[in-house]
Structure formats: C-alpha cells, structure tokens
Amino acid sequence: MNNIKTFDVKNQRNLTMLVDFYELTMSNGYLLDGAKDRIVYFDMFFRKVPEKGGYAIMAGLEQVIEYVESLKFDKGDIDYLRSLDCFSEEFLEYLANFKFTGSIYAMKEGT
C-alpha cells in the first residue's frame, strides 16, 4: 500500500500569492520603465547546500511547473496588492490578466 502523500498544486486553493514580493515590485518597475514586453529572467535557487551538505538533489520540478502554469491573480489578490499602495494600476490590470507564456529551464528531476 502506498502511504506517500503528494501535493497536487492544480487541486489546491489559489497559491499565486506565494510569489516573492520582490519579483512583483521588479515586474512593476519593468512595466513603469516601458519594458513590459522585454524578456526577463527570474530564478529559483539556493546559494548554499543546507546543513553543511555536500550535494543537493533536484526534486519537485513537476510541482514548480504546475504552480507557474496555474498562476492567476484573482480579485482578492489584486485588491490586497492595491491596498499596499506599491503598484501602479496598469500593473495591477496586467496581473489580473496574467498568463505565463515563458520557458522553464531546469536540471533533470532526481539529479
């Protein structure tokens, strides 16, 4: 019997707001600078192997891809971001209509 629990991003509540706030502020800056259509890169990584470890194994790539592909800012997300008074209305409108269309480059799962 398989007792392993998995996390299915597609069937969970909206996880969009787990995004890094810095990424949102930078994206708003790109838009305000007229670079809305410029290709940019954001990374998901760590700088140092934890606990003085000597290696790391890539795991969870499928869930990362599902998360990115399902990113959708709902009305509550937009209202919250608006309440912070950090983002332009143009950017909030952009987020409300956002759909990921980029590419994801990653190490092979399990390596």
PLM regions and their residue ranges:
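Ordered alpha/beta subdomains of enzyme catalytic regions
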Residues: 1-111
